[in-house]
């Protein structure tokens, strides 16, 4: 016959600090692209808002764009660069 010694189960939760959850109010961020704006390589006033001072494409998190909008914006910026509407790099002078 097998003998097992049952140990009393300890509660380790008493050593842990209680978790405090700070609920932040949910803010709805407005999209920087309005409903009338078309993401197009010819729309330079729109494209220039999503490029850094060095000429880099800003990330979607910085831009507050959806992934689909960011993808369309990236393609429009690249197309504008190829057609020489935008420089690939900005001079630092």
UniProtKB/Swiss-Prot annotation:
The alphabetized UniProt keywords are: Chloroplast, Plastid, Ribonucleoprotein, Ribosomal protein, RNA-binding, rRNA-binding
* UniProt KW rRNA-binding keyword: yes
- State what protein this is by name: Small ribosomal subunit protein bS18c
UniProt lists the family membership as follows: Belongs to the bacterial ribosomal protein bS18 family.
What are its GO biological-process terms? Answer: translation
Any one cellular component term from GO for this entry?
mitochondrial small ribosomal subunit
By its UniProt entry, which HAMAP family does this protein fall under? Ribosomal_bS18 (MF_00270)
Localization (cell): Plastid, Chloroplast
Self-association and partners: Part of the 30S ribosomal subunit.
Q: Which InterPro entries match?
A: Ribosomal_bS18, Ribosomal_bS18_CS, Ribosomal_bS18_sf
Organism of provenance: Pinus koraiensis
Question: Do you know which PANTHER family this protein is assigned to?
Answer: 30S RIBOSOMAL PROTEIN S18, SMALL RIBOSOMAL SUBUNIT PROTEIN BS18M
Q: Does the keyword Chloroplast apply?
A: yes
Which PROSITE patterns does UniProt cross-reference here?
RIBOSOMAL_S18
Q: Which GO terms describe its molecular function?
A: small ribosomal subunit rRNA binding; structural constituent of ribosome
């Amino acid at each position: 016959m097998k003998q097992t010694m049952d140990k009393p189960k300890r509660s380790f939760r008493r050593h842990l600090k209680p978790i405090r959850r700070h609920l932040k109010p949910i803010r709805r961020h407005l999209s920087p692209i309005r409903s009338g704006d078309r993401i197009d390589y010819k729309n330079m006033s729109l494209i220039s808002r999503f490029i850094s001072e060095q000429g880099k494409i800003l990330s979607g998190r910085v831009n507050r764009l959806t992934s689909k909008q960011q993808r369309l914006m990236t393609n429009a910026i690249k197309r504008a660069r190829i057609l020489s509407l935008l420089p690939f790099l900005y001079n630092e002078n």
